[in-house]
Every structure is written in structure tokens, then in C-alpha cells.
């Protein structure tokens, strides 16, 4: 009896040691795993950041992966032009050449088959080139803040010959500029500085935000993306609400949420290149009537940054780490993410009492 009990005790002790080792190993693994949550409104550049992580830390896009983006890029180009043509009537803009009205009819007749096949036929290419070159269409494009048009429109429409070629294979820049609405939750894992990162991208549309709560558990850091150039634009969802106002409200709710008291908060003030171009034409007062500064990139960017940082109601205990970014610029994102990682590591060490 005593011998049997001793044997059972030894086995229990062995099991206990195995469990302890497993728990220590799991604890160390969790310390080495960084869960990054990408948040922000639609069109703020979150999905482009995910693509950049794949390029910088996961080997990029091989030939087959590049080919898979061709139908999306074709769709983006066609969709951009059809949006411009539809907006002509609403903005009361006429074609410079009346013959383009027939091309517009042809555009809508030919786009369905082209989108389903993922290719632009020579006939459709001719139609698209003539429409895009028309001064009336260009005037409509210059007023794109009055309707919904993606940032990549001019990039693709200025290069129709290349993307319509039968042997077209998307470049990395083509892929970075492609736009596909994120629905659901997209996870991307990669290793950097001996840490495993799990980056979680959640759709930014209002209808998608109810899913965010499912991602909050165990978050190490939040990267909140802001569309700097969206200060004169309205939401897709209601065509009434300012995109910048929506972004500020959303950031306020995240920054001051009790879930994230010990979570590093990083602010990506994105699309700085588009802000620099737009601010010369459209004043910041269209969004911030109280703004008294010059309509220069430097002053406007700092003013917008301050609007977000001032929402932090816990400045003594919570710091916001702000960076101006261009999500389509790989070198910029690589530099910024390196700095972000150092901040996350330092804050993690403080949190577990090792720093």
C-alpha cells in the first residue's frame, strides 16, 4: 500500500513538473508574441499596412501571388472610370467632345464581361482611353471630393495600356495601390526582432465595427490609422458625415477605453503624400473652421495630429506614439515599423516589471 502510494506520488510529481514546464514555456511564448490590432475607419490604409508587412517581413509576393491581383486591379481601373462618368451628370459637366457620350454607353456595355473575365479587351481599352482623356472627364475627376472615388484612380487610368496588356503581371506597387474592401477579420503572422507578430486587420466600415470586440483580448498594441487626406470627404455609408470627424470620434472611443489601459497606442497619420498635394487646393477650414494656420502640409499635418492627441484623457499615464506615414511607400513603413517595434518592446518590459 505504502509503495503504491509512493509510486502514485512520484507520478503526480512528474506530471506537475511537466505542467509547470509547459506553463513556463507557454508564458515565454506569449511574451514573445505581439498581438497588433489595426483599427481605423474605412479607407485609412490598414490593409495596405498588412501588405507592407508581407513585403518587409514575409518574403513579399511571388509571381503567382502577383498574378492573383490582376482581376482586382482591372476592376479598380474600370470602377474608377465608371464612377467618374456617372458623376458627370450629377455635377452638370458635359463631355468636351460629344462623341464621348457614345463611348460612355459602350463603357457600361463592355464592363460587365471585362470584370467577369478579369481582362480589358482592345475595344474596351480604346473606349476607356478616349473617355479618360476627355477634358470633361478630367474636370469631373478634379472634383472627386464631391463623390466617391478611390485614391488609386489616376494611378491606374494613367497606365491603361500596361494593365490592359494580355501578358500583364501586376507589380508590387500595383498591388499596394489596389483596393478591396476588408470584411471580417484578417490575421497576418510574421517574425521580427525575435518576436512573433500577429497583426489583426478588421474592416473599418460601420457595419464591421461590431466585430472589433472579438479581437480585443490579449492585444499588446493598437495601430490606429487616420486618412489625413480625408478631411474634405464624406463617409461611404451615409454621404453626410465627415470622414475626419468619424475618425476622431472613433479614436476617442479607443484611446479612452478601459480595455486598453495597458495597451500601447500608436497613431499612423497616413496618406501624408495625398495631404501634401490636396492642401494646396482645398483649405483645411472645410473640416476645421477654427483653423488659423497656413494651408501648407507642415502646418495642416501638425494641426490634425494635435486634434487626435488632445483626445487623450489620461495624458499622465498613457502616451500616444504618432507617426506620419505613406502606406504605399515601403521604405517609410519599414522605418516607422522598426521604431514602433522598439516602443512596443519597451512598454512590454515595463508592463511585466523587467524595465
Swiss-Prot record:
A GO CC term assigned to this protein in UniProt: cell body
Quote the biased-composition stretches of kind Basic and acidic residues, using this chain's numbering.
1-14
Q: Where in the cell is it found?
A: Membrane
| G-alpha domain residues | 32-355
The record's family statement is: Belongs to the G-alpha family. G(i/o/t/z) subfamily.
Please describe the quaternary structure of this protein. G-proteins are composed of 3 units; alpha, beta and gamma. The alpha chain contains the guanine nucleotide binding site. Interacts with ADGRB2.
The entry's protein name is Guanine nucleotide-binding protein G(z) subunit alpha
Amino acid at each position: 500500500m505504502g509503495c503504491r502510494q509512493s509510486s502514485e506520488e512520484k507520478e503526480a510529481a512528474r506530471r506537475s513538473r511537466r505542467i509547470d514546464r509547459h506553463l513556463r514555456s507557454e508564458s515565454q511564448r506569449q511574451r514573445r508574441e505581439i498581438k497588433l490590432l489595426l483599427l481605423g475607419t474605412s479607407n485609412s490604409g490598414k490593409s495596405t499596412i498588412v501588405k507592407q508587412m508581407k513585403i518587409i517581413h514575409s518574403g513579399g509576393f511571388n509571381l503567382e501571388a502577383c498574378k492573383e491581383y490582376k482581376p482586382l486591379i482591372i476592376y479598380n481601373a474600370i470602377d474608377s472610370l465608371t464612377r467618374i462618368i456617372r458623376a458627370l451628370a450629377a455635377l452638370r459637366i458635359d463631355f468636351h467632345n460629344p462623341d464621348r457620350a457614345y463611348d460612355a454607353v459602350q463603357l457600361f456595355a463592355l464592363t460587365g464581361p471585362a470584370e467577369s473575365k478579369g481582362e480589358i479587351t482592345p475595344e474596351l481599352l480604346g473606349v476607356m482611353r478616349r473617355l479618360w482623356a476627355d477634358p470633361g472627364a478630367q474636370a469631373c475627376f478634379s472634383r472627386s471630393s464631391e463623390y466617391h472615388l478611390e485614391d488609386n484612380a489616376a494611378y491606374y487610368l494613367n497606365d491603361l495600356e500596361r494593365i490592359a496588356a494580355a501578358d500583364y503581371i501586376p507589380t508590387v506597387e500595383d498591388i499596394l495601390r489596389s483596393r478591396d474592401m476588408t470584411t471580417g477579420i484578417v490575421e497576418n503572422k510574421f517574425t521580427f526582432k525575435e518576436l512573433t507578430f500577429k497583426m489583426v486587420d478588421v474592416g473599418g466600415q460601420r457595419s464591421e465595427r461590431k466585430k472589433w470586440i472579438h479581437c480585443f483580448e490579449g492585444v499588446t498594441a493598437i495601430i490606429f490609422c487616420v486618412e489625413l487626406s480625408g478631411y474634405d470627404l464624406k463617409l461611404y455609408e451615409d454621404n453626410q458625415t465627415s470622414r475626419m470627424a468619424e475618425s476622431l470620434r472613433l479614436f476617442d472611443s479607443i484611446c479612452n477605453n478601459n480595455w486598453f489601459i495597458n495597451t500601447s497606442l500608436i497613431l499612423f497619420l497616413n496618406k501624408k503624400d495625398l495631404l501634401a498635394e490636396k492642401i494646396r487646393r482645398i483649405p483645411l477650414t472645410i473640416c476645421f473652421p477654427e483653423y488659423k494656420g497656413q494651408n501648407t502640409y507642415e502646418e495642416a499635418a501638425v494641426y490634425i495630429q494635435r486634434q487626435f492627441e488632445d483626445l487623450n484623457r489620461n495624458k499622465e499615464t498613457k502616451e500616444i506614439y504618432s507617426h506620419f506615414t505613406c502606406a504605399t511607400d515601403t521604405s517609410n513603413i519599414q522605418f516607422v515599423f522598426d521604431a514602433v517595434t522598439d516602443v512596443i518592446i519597451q512598454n512590454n518590459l515595463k508592463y511585466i516589471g523587467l524595465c
